[in-house]
Amino acid sequence: MRLAILGGIAVTPERVIEDAGILIDEDGRISFVDTREQLEECEDWEDEIELGEKDVIMPGLINTHTHGPMTLFRGVADDMPLMKWLREEIWPLEERLDAEKCRWGAALAAMEALKSGTTCLADMYFFMDAVAEAYAEVGIRAVISHGMIDLGEEDKREEELKESKRVYRKCQGMEGLIEFSLGPHAPYTCSEELLKEVRRLADEWGVKIQIHVAETEDEVKEVKRKHGKRPVEYLDEIGLLGDDVIAAHCVWLDDKEIEILSKRGVIVSHNPISNMKLASGISPVPEMLERGVNVTIGTDGCASNNNLDMLEEIKVAALLHKVNKMDPSATEMLEILRMATVRAGTVFSSEKIGAIEEGYAADLVVLDGSSPRLNPNHNPISNIVYSASGSDVKHVFVAGELVVKNGKLVKADEQEILENSTECAEQLTSS
């Protein structure tokens, strides 16, 4: 059944179209984008949704780095540096996780993400088959990976690869919203043998790789001590890097590493709020963009953010580099929006996502034009980047299916998700 979305202001993001007309085909892809008048003149359809005159319709936001089930850890460990935070708080809690807890944590993440305008997540965590099932049921698109850490131990390496292969098999045949990827945690927690096997499997299976890179200065020192090179140089030397790699953080880079990231086509996920909260540093985003690196935006997990609101994240990303450079033009609003939409669409392989253009998946977000934050609307892109909040989200479509209607989930029971995720969180943190 073909669906027409009529009215509102469409931000594609390359064009702004007033009184828009968008047609979604039977496969959940966009088949027409223009004005309502043009749509009515040359197309027909079976169903339609009428938007308010001031409503803004935009591509769904793409969160290129997160750990969905960590919603269960929201507010548990704050105001700590990364390694202390991991070793004393997060890793001990993660030892108590199981598939059921990760499933409900992921359901909560999907609920929060969709209701704040995110339609796709790149997620690295544990019990990822359960996470994938939760994401599919709630209705969000996701690239999932089992986070692998071997610390140079052969038995642990085999165990991690076995789990990744199990999740890979489980994900085969899942509905098209879910894609599998490989997830070596970081160059300081993964052996060279594991990283080389990840590259071999990624080539064999045709899947993405997700990895944390150069998040802290201490990580850079540790990798240099072990391997004699900085993290990006080391990963390039062993053959891991390519345009199928999603490198999260990339805070502590030198000029040579930026050139390598550009040359290899690596997808960088900039996580400004998490990096600020953990005082990890400021990623050299303007320098990377200038040299052609594909920089995207992610939230990281809820334990270090502490939410999944990508509209908040893009505003912080826009502002952080202005003040860091003492230059208000250091980052421009359209480029920031691209980083969270069409640039980020490269994380998903089987569909074109991240733009309102013909042939792209109909992953769409409608912002409520009656929100005071969106009025007056002199510039819709400015309002999206600098004014909007996740609470302004009215409707969300994923693959042409309405999954949020008037701010409420359509496919899942919100109360059930809240009750079960809260119970799981209490079990984790009870002594």
From Swiss-Prot:
InterPro entries annotated for this entry?
Amidohydro-rel (IPR006680), Deaminase_MtaD/DadD (IPR023512), Metal-dep_hydrolase_composite (IPR011059), Metal_Hydrolase (IPR032466), MTA/SAH_deaminase (IPR050287)
Q: Which CDD domains match?
A: ATZ_TRZ_like
- Enzyme kind, highest EC tier: hydrolase
**Chain residues that bind substrate:** E94, H185, E215, D300
Quote the Pfam families the UniProt record gives: Amidohydro_1 (PF01979)
Any other noteworthy remark? SAH is a product of SAM methyltransferases and is known to be a feedback inhibitor of these enzymes. As a result of this inhibition, organisms have evolved efficient enzymes to metabolize SAH via different pathways. The pathway found in methanogens differs from the canonical pathway, it uses the deamination of S-adenosyl-L-homocysteine to form S-inosyl-L-homocysteine for the regeneration of SAM from S-adenosyl-L-homocysteine. 5'-deoxyadenosine is a radical SAM enzyme reaction product which strongly inhibits radical SAM enzymes.
Q: What does this protein do?
A: Catalyzes the deamination of three SAM-derived enzymatic products, namely 5'-deoxyadenosine, S-adenosyl-L-homocysteine, and 5'-methylthioadenosine, to produce the inosine analogs. Can also deaminate adenosine. The preferred substrate for this enzyme is 5'-deoxyadenosine, but all these substrates are efficiently deaminated. Likely functions in a S-adenosyl-L-methionine (SAM) recycling pathway from S-adenosyl-L-homocysteine (SAH) produced from SAM-dependent methylation reactions.
This chain's protein is named 5'-deoxyadenosine deaminase
Q: Which organism is it from?
A: Methanopyrus kandleri (strain AV19 / DSM 6324 / JCM 9639 / NBRC 100938)
